[in-house]
């Protein structure tokens, strides 16, 4: 699929996948869930960059969440964001795709988690986000930095972080299957 067609497919609710050519450390071999994509810019969260500490250790009010906090991206890395499956329970949630929601009332979220109504496996917390201004992401597509793919809530909440990039690239089929199996630094082979 050509670069133009890849970019045309990009929308909120799609996956943004770093191409094998994208070596910039913030995004090398990342898979992002896109939550906004419009003429003003784009916003998403890196799905496969868990941090070395748990949500309960880093986010006040979420003492029962023994799940990793994730690096969502390099923008505003002092802010906490969350994706979850329960828009029916959390006021102010924005549906990204059926069964996947972004944000909502944090106090309500904390109560639901701490009382066991909401399971930690139904939510993913991110520190910061990935953001692009108008035209910036389109230019990166033209440079060959990104691919797109369809998303499901199961992909967002999968715990297989290390293999997420290769599995997602492979799922595109065709020439992408070869790319998915390529080593990170082919020149060192």
Swiss-Prot record:
Source organism, top-level taxon: Bacteria
Coiled coil: none
Gene3D superfamilies assigned: VC0467-like
A Pfam family the protein falls into: DUF179
Residues of the signal peptide: none
GO cellular component, one term: cytosol
Family in the record: Belongs to the UPF0301 (AlgH) family.
UniProt xrefs under PANTHER family: UNCHARACTERIZED PROTEIN YQGE (PTHR30327), UPF0301 PROTEIN YQGE (PTHR30327:SF1)
Name of protein: UPF0301 protein Plut_0637
Species per Swiss-Prot/TrEMBL record: Chlorobium luteolum (strain DSM 273 / BCRC 81028 / 2530) (Pelodictyon luteolum)
């Amino acid at each position: 699929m050509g670069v133009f067609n890849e970019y045309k497919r990009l929308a909120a609710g799609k996956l943004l996948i770093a191409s094998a050519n994208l070596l910039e450390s913030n995004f090398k071999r990342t898979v992002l869930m896109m939550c906004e994509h419009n003429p003003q810019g784009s916003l998403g969260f890196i799905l496969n960059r868990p941090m070395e500490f748990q949500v309960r250790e880093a986010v006040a009010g979420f003492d029962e969440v023994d799940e990793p906090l994730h690096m969502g991206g390099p923008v505003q890395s002092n802010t906490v964001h969350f994706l979850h499956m329960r828009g029916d329970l959390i006021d102010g949630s924005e549906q990204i795709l059926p069964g996947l929601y972004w944000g909502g009332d944090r106090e309500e979220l904390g109560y639901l988690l701490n009382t066991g109504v909401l399971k930690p496996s139904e939510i993913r917390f991110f520190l910061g986000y990935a953001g692009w201004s108008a035209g910036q992401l389109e230019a990166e597509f033209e440079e060959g930095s990104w691919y797109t793919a369809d998303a499901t809530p199961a992909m967002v909440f999968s715990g297989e972080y290390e293999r997420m990039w290769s599995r997602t690239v492979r799922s595109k089929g065709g020439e992408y299957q070869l790319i998915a199996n390529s080593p990170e630094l082919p020149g060192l082979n």
